[in-house]
């Protein structure tokens, strides 16, 4: 085992394959995790069973790590995490392409194409999500940059602002037609009425699931840690996020 761990290149992905209860975690991953901690490297763990957290929390604290936990299964023992913080940071730095790339990745997590038959709904919902987020980055206050605001934007968007326009069309009509916010959202607000209503419904569904729970909405509205700390300080971050992420 020691020889195997020494051969692992930490700059590359490692896939450990084996049957259930074959000892993958105890025999390979836990020893590798020990080595990472002993080398004072930062760790991010998607820990659905909380086995890493339960086994390594005390060791991480003793080694001087800051431990942050995003746990949507146990809301009373979770730090806050706003998934829009990072793209918003890059947007404010003038790196709009980077912000849009991150938002697009997040959108495809929210709206996966499970059947991989017709990617239309996944792609158009992601585009609307990206467009709304970029519009929020441009016009919103910092405390409004969260998934709750995106959901509100969608639910209000189909309401009539006038006899001929809804609020979604009215709002984006004020935007530069060459802007990324306008282009991404235009696939929806320029669509026929029935198609537009279907897109809004599909886009709203996973967001409503998140923000419909007051405590979850609160946790996802404000980060209680600086994401820069993941590279600048010794940190262990554990995620237990069912369903969407």
Language-model region placement:
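P-loop NTPase motor domains
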Residues: 4-245
């Amino acid at each position: 085992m020691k020889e195997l761990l020494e051969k692992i290149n930490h700059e590359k992905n490692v896939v450990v394959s084996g049957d259930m209860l074959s000892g993958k975690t105890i025999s390979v991953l836990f020893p590798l995790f020990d080595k990472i901690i002993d080398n004072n490297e930062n760790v991010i763990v998607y820990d659905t069973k909380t086995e890493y957290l339960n086994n390594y929390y005390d060791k991480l604290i003793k080694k001087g790590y800051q431990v942050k936990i995003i746990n949507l299964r146990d809301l009373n023992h979770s730090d806050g995490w706003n998934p829009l913080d990072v793209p918003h940071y890059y947007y404010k730095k003038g790196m709009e392409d980077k912000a849009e790339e991150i938002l697009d990745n997040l959108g495809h997590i929210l709206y996966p194409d499970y059947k991989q038959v017709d990617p239309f709904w996944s792609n158009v919902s992601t585009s609307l999500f990206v467009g709304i987020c970029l519009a929020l980055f441009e016009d919103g206050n910092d405390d409004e940059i969260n998934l709750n605001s995106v959901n509100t934007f969608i639910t209000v968007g189909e309401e009539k602002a006038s006899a001929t326009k809804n609020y979604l069309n009215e709002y984006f009509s004020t935007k530069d037609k060459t802007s990324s916010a306008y282009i991404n959202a235009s696939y929806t607000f320029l669509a026929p009425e029935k198609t537009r209503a279907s897109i809004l419904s599909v886009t709203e569904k996973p967001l409503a699931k998140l923000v419909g729970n007051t405590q979850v909405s609160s946790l996802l509205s404000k980060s209680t840690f600086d994401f820069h700390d993941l590279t600048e300080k010794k940190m262990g971050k554990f995620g237990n996020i069912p369903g969407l992420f």
